[in-house]
From Swiss-Prot:
Subunit structure: Component of a hexamer of two molecules each of IL6, IL6R and IL6ST; first binds to IL6R to associate with the signaling subunit IL6ST. Interacts with IL6R (via the N-terminal ectodomain); this interaction may be affected by IL6R-binding with SORL1, hence decreasing IL6 cis signaling. Interacts with SORL1 (via the N-terminal ectodomain); this interaction leads to IL6 internalization and lysosomal degradation. May form a trimeric complex with the soluble SORL1 ectodomain and soluble IL6R receptor; this interaction might stabilize circulating IL6, hence promoting IL6 trans signaling.
Phosphoserine PTM positions: 78
Function: Cytokine with a wide variety of biological functions in immunity, tissue regeneration, and metabolism. Binds to IL6R, then the complex associates to the signaling subunit IL6ST/gp130 to trigger the intracellular IL6-signaling pathway. The interaction with the membrane-bound IL6R and IL6ST stimulates 'classic signaling', whereas the binding of IL6 and soluble IL6R to IL6ST stimulates 'trans-signaling'. Alternatively, 'cluster signaling' occurs when membrane-bound IL6:IL6R complexes on transmitter cells activate IL6ST receptors on neighboring receiver cells.
Disordered as annotated region, ranges: 28-47
Protein name, entry field: Interleukin-6
Coiled-coil ranges (or none): none
Coarse class of the protein's main subcellular location: secreted
Signal peptide range in chain numbering: 1-26
Organism domain of life: Eukaryota
Biological-process GO terms, alphabetical: acute-phase response; glucose homeostasis; hepatocyte proliferation; interleukin-6-mediated signaling pathway; liver regeneration; positive regulation of multicellular organismal process; positive regulation of receptor signaling pathway via JAK-STAT; positive regulation of receptor signaling pathway via STAT
Disulfide links within the chain: 69-75, 98-108
Length: 209
């Protein structure tokens, strides 16, 4: 595990180097030091090991949710349903072709990729505002971006993948920044819970691809 001497920026750079190892890039990339071999790095993956990578991200989300529950009493609460609706977080539905009944690999891959791109806006908010384990928060954000890269390698019609409008990103960030502390904690909890659900359904879909 990283020690306190490692800043979130250093952690992010280390994780990006792991990403470079998993997916070679056009230019030369420096190697990692032996000290960076920790549980905070994702497994070295290729696109055919997407299942293990999704499990890795789910493990980080679980750790963050446990911390939110222990520190801020942000556990399951049905009263937060209204706030969740206001966030308009991505969900997988029957029409997305990801369920066993009516499964369609291309439609499903496209929807999962689009959904994770939509989550990036919310994960950026967590990365900036999470007051607990910054390493895990950074890991979820960066690893989800890497998962999108992995999925894009499998999508045949990449032009069907919808990228969020930059103006939506800007306006949502402005709204989220204006929240008080209680609502910030609630928002982070809801984003993590929704991403966990989304990835659980995605994991089941990947297993039957």
């Amino acid at each position: 595990r990283f020690t306190s001497a490692f800043s979130p920026v250093a952690f992010s750079l280390g994780l990006l180097l792991v990403m470079a190892t998993a997916f070679p890039t056009p230019g030369p990339v420096g190697g990692e030091s032996q000290a960076d071999a920790t549980s905070n790095r994702p497994p070295l993956t290729s696109p055919d090991k997407m299942e293990e990578f999704i499990k890795y991200i789910l493990g980080k989300i679980s750790a963050l949710r446990k911390e939110m529950c222990d520190k801020y009493n942000k556990c399951e609460d049905s009263k937060e349903a209204l706030a969740e609706n206001n966030l308009r977080l991505p969900k997988l539905a029957e029409k997305d072709g990801c369920f066993q009944s009516g499964f369609n690999q291309e439609t499903c891959l496209t929807r999962i990729t689009t959904g994770l791109l939509e989550f990036q806006i919310h994960l950026k908010y967590i990365q900036a505002n999470y007051e607990g384990n910054k390493e895990d928060a950074n890991s979820v954000y960066i690893s989800t971006k890497l998962l999108v890269q992995m999925l894009m390698k499998k999508v045949k019609s990449q032009d069907e993948v919808t990228t969020p409008d930059p103006t939506t990103d800007t306006s949502l960030q402005a709204i989220l920044k204006a929240q008080d502390k209680w609502l910030k904690h609630t928002t982070i909890h809801l984003i993590l819970r929704s991403l966990e659900d989304f990835l659980q359904f995605s994991l089941r879909a990947v297993r039957i691809m």
